[in-house]
Amino acid sequence: MIAPYRSTPVFDENSLPAALRGEHSTKAGVWGVIRVLEGRMRLDYADPPSTRLMEAGEAALCLPQQAHSVAPLGPMRMRVDFYDRDPAGDAPV
């Protein structure tokens, strides 16, 4: 299993930055894994358009340059791990 080269701090429903709540993407060559630690949140992918409701213990992969946004659904805690290669190719996300 590969280790992330960087991780965000743990965010809650109050500390989640506006930049993550709005549409954004990772850079070329950067995969993001969103990890819900507690509670629930919504992950919206822009292209192709889809929505995923996530609960504690779940993780979701964001591909390089894939536009997306997140929104808390009540109290929650989450973080994002960043990888320089596809973590799904090595082990379950």
Predicted segments with their positions:
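A short, N-terminal "cap"/entry segment at the start of jelly-roll beta-barrel domains
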Residues: 1-26
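Double-stranded beta-helix
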Residues: 7-15, 80-93
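Short histidine-centered beta-strand/loop micro-motifs
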Residues: 20-28, 44-45, 52-53, 70-72, ...
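Short, conserved beta-strand element in jelly-roll/cupin
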Residues: 28-42
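Beta-strand-centric surfaces of beta-sandwich/beta-rich domains
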Residues: 35, 58-61, 74
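Short acidic-glycine-tyrosine-enriched beta hairpin
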Residues: 48-65
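Ligand-binding loop in jelly-roll beta-barrel domains
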Residues: 64-89
